[in-house]
Amino acid sequence: MNIGDDKSEVDVIIDSSSITLNNNESSNNNTNIGDVLKFESGLYNSFECELINQVFNSVPIMMGVCDLYDNSNSDFQIQDSQNYDFKFVISNRCSYDNLHMFLDKGKGLDGHYSAKELHLPAYFITLWIENMLRSLRKKKSVKFMYPRYVDNGETPSSDDFYSQKIVWKKSTMCFMGQVLVPLDDINSNSNNNSNQKQTACRFFFTSEEVTKEKFKKEELINDFKSRLETLENKIDQRVDERIETRFKYVLESIPQMVWVTDNHGKIEFVNRQWKDYLGIDHSGQYLNWGSISYQQHNNNNNNNNNNNNNNNNNNNNNSNNKSPIINSPNTTSPTNTQIDFDSQWHYSLKEMKRFEMEILLQSMSGEYRWFLVRAEPYIEPNLGHPSSPLPSIISACVDNCDIMTDDNSSGILINNNNNIQQPYLNNDNISGDNVNNTPTCIDNNNNNIDGSNNSVNSTGTEQLDIKWIGTCTDVNDQKTAQDRIENAEKSKALFLQTMSHEMRTPLAGIMGINSWLSTSSPQLTSEQLDGCHTIDMCAEALLVLINNILDLSKLEENKIILEETEFYPTKIVEDSVDILSSQAEQKKLDIIFQLKYNCLSKVVGDFYRIRQVLTNLISNSVKFTPANGQIIVGCEIYHETTPSTRKRSSLDSIEITIPCNHNNSNNSNNNHNHNNNNNNNNHLNCSGSFNNNGFNHGHHHHHHHHHHHHHHHDKHCDQKIIVPGKYGKLLFWVIDNGIGIPEEGREKLFQTFSQYDASTTRKYGGSGLGLAISKRLTQLLGGDIWFESQKGKGSSFHFLVEVFFPDYPTIYNQQLQQQQQQPNLPHQFNIGTSAPQPIDSILTSYSSNNSNNNINNNNITTSVISQSPIVDKSNLCTYIFLLSTNQVLVNSLSQWINEWIGNATNNNNSNNDNNNNNTTSTTTTTTTTTATINTNINQQVKILYDIDSIEQISNSAIQSGKRLDFLFLIEDTFWNNYSDKISNSQEIIESLINQNYQQQQQQQQEQRQQHNIKNVILSFSNSAQIYGNSIILKKPIKYSPLKDCIYTNLLYFKSIYSVNSFDVIIATQMSSSVSPSSLSSSPSIQGLTNSSLSINNINISGNNSNNNINNNNNNSGSSTPKKLKKSNSDQSIHFSPSLTSSSLPSLDLNNNNNINNNNNINNNNNINNNNNNNNNNNNNNNNNNNNLNHYNSDSILSSDLSPQQHQYHHPNPLLANYQKKRRNSVVNDTDIPLEMTGIRYPLKIMVAEDSLVNQKVACRFLTKLGYKKEEIIFVVNGQQAIDHIENVEMVDVILMDMQMPEVDGCEATTRIRMRYPTTGPHIIGLTANAFNEDKDKCLLSGMCHYLAKPVKMDILAVELKRAWLIRNKFRVCLCAVL
């Protein structure tokens, strides 16, 4: 049909989802979808109308508008479809094609009534009218489905639903509103009412055919329902007694006890199992669980106490009987909490809800067993045929009702026996409004689950007969097995905990005595020392195995607790390599870093668990890579495409709770002395506090260890601070060129206790736990691990972990706003409070004492700054020759070097701008330079990868009067292969210099040009003589040692970071945490910028270093050229920023290099040494130190370095008062040997240990550290420790074992803290237990720190130094980990 037909009848109202057509006013007044304004304005022309008509008729589904008429004039209130008829107003071509078989020849659909004129099938008319009424009631569209024969209009039979004879129609009926139509449309014979109108309801309809593939599931459901209906009909009608007999036989033969009651709880049927177990046939009695279940006070209940009770009103008489209790099967006498089963049963009867409980039922032999008792209500309607007997329906399966209703349903089951042959799919399910031959779930209000009222009860013509079908399933064996499993898990955990302690105790003795023996017996031969080393290696391997087993057990029990802290990702990579560097060195394995330092900022995560995974992977690569192989280790930010599935409370922030600071008053009063003993006061506060240096250490959830007698913690004053940021992932990788993994061994690679080669002749050992633990840890950390491998060529392992990326600019702004709200403080605190220092502005240098790569360059001697000449950068010809046969190493080092060149250039330009503008460096901003390969030929520092053009470069530079500034970075393998070529090239340079010198003499020039040429060998060896006394930079090559080497040995970088600008640099660094006003007003800053500062210790080498840069030539200020291939001295030495910064004081306990510290290594070269005694007033010195204590001694004092470029210390806490530092963040006095610890840090020490072996180890350790044996007190239990303190003398430190007889360590600590809350000793827990709960127990009892055995001597020394620092101020340490 065309849209233009019957224009007077077309009145389609358009809303947001329909089309409105209104042709009453104009023939052109048609509309397109969504263009109502154009339609109302009558702007459509005939062409557009025709186009709309064509589109409407081309739609491949039935579509149109129809009106519903109420023939009974009931205002659409009657629900009977016989009182209604509908007329098609407008329909498309598809509608006509689908219904034309029912129409008279030449008759269309539009304008005709469905029943009176078109004679459509009755079931079709009824279905459409009922759904129109539904849409009218709900005031929204309804969806329904119905079947139809392809070739006729007969009513579909259910047998043909899924045959080829049937097509299914999916239809939508949408109520559009009411319209007024002429009365003659309804009654055409009436001519008197031509002007009268009647209301009709207008609907928009669509109908489309659904493919049969979508009904496979419905076909199975229909088949199942048909079978179920057949079974129910046979039971209802009782047509075959044999079937009923067989059915009852099934009930009698199943192992469950089956019973049936009426809606009052009266038993109608019990099967044989019920009778056999309970010994009584309870048919005809009211079900009383109290009489057949266990009773706490009366085990011999009378089972027949209700036998004579046949009154329905008395069905609750026994509800007050003594109720049974739930008892564990493995106990001899039940004593658990009593439960009133009868009350629960009567409640289920009343509310018509499922009854399900575990009940301990007593057999006729007196045995008690656990049964799962389940009962479901079943409703069978009586269809008004009183003569027909109601069958007693009995269910034969335990979970029979689960088929019809889910476990959480509060409804009951109804079987409607209306034999209706027109099943319809309503909302994609086979159903219809109040027409249904399938079971329907109704709620307690007699409503269907779809919200409509159930017609069974609403009509009042049917009576409901409710039956309760129940089963009792014996679960005693399962419950007993579950208890056994739980007990086994507990026993396993206890066994592991006990074995951990028992294995660590002798292992601690082995490692302790061996360590003491190897370090305190100089008369040992080399073979004996090698034997000690072998013992230590075996003990370490055994310790790793014990730790792996413990980790695996904790992972299996989900007891791993992630301890989040703030760290640099590059720190994890470097630490992991450091752990295995000695093993790699033995096999001459090149470990190459692929790290972009300026792209990896601080993150928050579990530092040590991530490092554990990476260490396992590197360890495998070292093990399976042949000698002279290569291992690549790297990290980067992973940009995931799919959101993480890990649960978290926020996606853009983390919430950290900070306890109240009860001890703030102690912080500001102990910062005025510049001695070592109070440089750590900032870390002694037991609770976190916020200051303008950042965040001090706070508590971390379960690590609140100080005893409640120290502080009564008030939860109401806790602060919850939101740290902005986002979650993301880090990608780590370890790539080697080892033996690879064969295909047959890959599937078991991550299995526990397995290797790809598990044969008895396998070449490589190992427990097979490392990768299994790594797999589970990465999953626990929100990531995963995977690998690629090719046999004989190597393997590459990658893993992802989820971390939190703090938003540092936002954090800094929040600190700044908080500082602006604080009141003005006294003058001496201006530096600490004027402006906050952002977290990432505290930059660390690898030249610190914690570094494993240090510069040990003996030819570098410090000069007085005032005597240091200024280098003209424009007069330098600076080249770095990177010579290596390993292209991967060249690419990695080139990236770093180009980054430093770019930073130096930016810094140089910035300094030039400041000098030109005559401004003071009072403010600075930290910039981040992306690490890219800089190939600009105009830059002043260039990188070359061969020496072929060195003669041309040197000759050109010398002829132009420039100074040669060459640094040769030569890998050892390249040196071994091309040493002659390198020597020849440097001899050529020397000859060119000599020729130029002779020409200068002829020209009578007084000043000779001084050149700077250095050789740095990248090697595993420490011997400089092998390489012609060159500087040695030990492999693996790290970021900061290489940077320090370049900055120290190239004049270009020295000219930029010259100590001549030391005052400007310091002022620049301070400006990040000091306002301009405080800089100008603080006398201490003025004194500092006037260079009234002496640095007695420029620490160039650290005692803890493993990798050194060695140069044995001590030539400073020499004016005569030496043999170039042997001489690497520079005539004018300027300090690199990293070296300069190591002398600054800090409150960080990791560094004790202080201004005017008399205990440091003597160094006769001081900065402005002649001004060292200008300030005779100690207060001025103290003020200077006070101000400098706000800065990290390892900071890089230049603005060219981004916060991400130096990441070498242990992971600092995120806003340091939010979280704890977890390990050894205490002063490491590397300027004194371990043997001097007792002399410099004298303490009265008590050892509380019941093991004589451990007492001996502790005694040897302490005497080795310099403590006198006669001053060490030994006790064997906690009570003796308490008695000694109370009756003899107080001690400074107690090394407290956790497990001791009589009184254990935790109990003894608690008593000591109660007795001496403020003057007690510093207690260090020494225990062989390694579980988190053991650590928490120690810390919560009041111990100051916790160390797991075996304890190493250097770690013990660190803790004793910490104790001395605290005891020297007569304070008690209340922090778990400082």
UniProtKB/Swiss-Prot annotation:
Entry annotated with the keyword ATP-binding: yes
Keyword Repressor assigned: no
Record-level GO cellular component terms: plasma membrane
GO molecular function: ATP binding; histidine phosphotransfer kinase activity; phosphorelay sensor kinase activity
Coiled coil: 212-242
All residue ranges annotated as the Response regulatory domain in the record: 1244-1364
Domain of life: Eukaryota
Keywords of this entry: ATP-binding, Coiled coil, Kinase, Nucleotide-binding, Phosphoprotein, Transducer, Transferase, Two-component regulatory system
Any one of the GO BP annotations: phosphorelay signal transduction system
Histidine kinase domain boundaries: 498-805
Enzyme class, spelled out: transferase
In-chain residues carrying the UniProt-annotated modification Phosphohistidine: 501
Alphabetical list of SUPFAM superfamilies matching this protein: ATPase domain of HSP90 chaperone/DNA topoisomerase II/histidine kinase, CheY-like, Homodimeric domain of signal transducing histidine kinase, PYP-like sensor domain (PAS domain)
Positions of post-translational 4-aspartylphosphate modification: 1297
Composition skew (Polar residues), residue ranges: 1188-1206
Reactions that this protein is recorded to catalyse: ATP + protein L-histidine = ADP + protein N-phospho-L-histidine
Region (Disordered): 294-337, 663-717, 905-924, 1103-1213
Post-translational modification: Activation probably requires transfer of a phosphate group between a histidine in the kinase core (transmitter) domain and an aspartate of the receiver domain.
Function: Acts as a receptor histidine kinase for a signal transduction pathway. This protein undergoes an ATP-dependent autophosphorylation at a conserved histidine residue in the kinase core, and a phosphoryl group is then transferred to a conserved aspartate residue in the receiver domain.
Record's protein name: Hybrid signal transduction histidine kinase H
